[in-house]
């Protein structure tokens, strides 16, 4: 040990705070030299602040999984905020999304309906120019909880069970195969209560029927009838309403009220779907619809654009 290290140790104080933060202080306890909350590894405790870039993968303070249940070295998964119009969080394996939270509306993530309950509220997201600061506080001081990214890619909420005197998982991001990002491919919706769990949207067929029948849904579905936007003499496209849905990835946000959201989509021949959600506003999709899931609590109404002939006798859905 060199003289500099001896001086550092002899003039500092280590303190384990009630929050779980291990802090190295100057000997007068006025300045923090180092703290474990700046290096959260695989866990998010109340008071930890994660920092993410809004426009790149330059994430400053992040959650990384362990390599295995017994090996704390950096594993395959990490929590990330990928460049999108709307704020949402991903668990990624390398650079590939594995799970997605859905857009943040200022109170909850649209892809996590259970977050409406008190036991999972308390998240705060602060916007600092091009950086986001994410933290959470206990909404109920009598309910102790923390979050962990497991070595196999699950984001878990852990609650203290007084009767068992132990921690118990009360929620996890991957509860079924439908929670895995894009499991059904493009233009398909995943429903954990159905067999098979993947189903093409109305107006679409499997891109590879043999793979689809064998349970390989990754190629998704393709449109049966081309959209008729700006085709002379053809009828205006219509919209199929899907209720209680996890909205697809790559939402494009525009300034529009609920009444005008559908109009904005119809005016753009590249627009494939739209949705309006309080706190988020008008969302349009101009790329393949991926990672749709059927919810049974909350969720959003998503309107899928189809050729008029795919919905004969049905009026254009109200936006």
What are these regions (language model features)?
Residues 1-319:
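Beta-rich ligand-binding surfaces for carbohydrates and other polyanions
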């Amino acid at each position: 040990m060199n003289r500099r290290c001896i001086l550092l140790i002899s003039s500092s104080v280590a303190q384990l705070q009630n929050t779980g933060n291990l802090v190295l202080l100057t000997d007068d306890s006025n300045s923090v030299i180092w703290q474990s909350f700046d290096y959260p590894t695989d866990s998010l405790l109340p008071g930890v602040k994660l920092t993410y870039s809004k426009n790149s993968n330059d994430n400053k303070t992040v959650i990384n999984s362990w390599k295995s249940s017994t090996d704390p070295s950096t594993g395959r998964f990490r929590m990330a905020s990928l460049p999108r119009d709307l704020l949402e969080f991903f668990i990624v394996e390398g650079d590939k999304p594995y799970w997605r939270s859905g857009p943040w509306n200022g109170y909850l993530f649209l892809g996590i309906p259970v977050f409406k309950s008190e036991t999972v509220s308390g998240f705060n997201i602060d916007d600092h120019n091009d950086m986001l600061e994410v933290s959470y506080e206990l909404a109920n001081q009598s309910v102790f909880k923390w979050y962990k990214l497991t070595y196999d890619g699950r984001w878990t909420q852990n609650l203290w069970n007084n009767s068992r005197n132990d921690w118990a998982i009360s929620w996890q991001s991957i509860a079924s195969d439908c929670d895995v990002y894009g499991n059904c491919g493009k233009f398909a919706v995943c429903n954990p209560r159905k067999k098979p769990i993947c189903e093409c949207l109305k107006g679409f067929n499997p891109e590879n029927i043999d793979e689809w029948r064998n349970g390989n849904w990754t190629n998704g579905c393709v449109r049966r009838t081309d959209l008729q936007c700006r085709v002379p003499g053809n009828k205006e496209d219509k919209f199929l309403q899907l209720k209680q849905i996890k909205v697809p990835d790559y939402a494009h946000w525009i300034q529009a009220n609920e009444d005008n959201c559908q109009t904005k989509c119809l005016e753009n021949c590249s627009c494939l779907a739209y949705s309006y959600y309080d706190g988020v506003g008008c969302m349009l999709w101009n790329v393949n619809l991926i990672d749709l899931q059927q919810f049974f609590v909350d969720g959003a109404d998503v309107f899928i654009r189809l050729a008029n002939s795919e919905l004969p006798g049905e009026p254009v859905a109200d936006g």
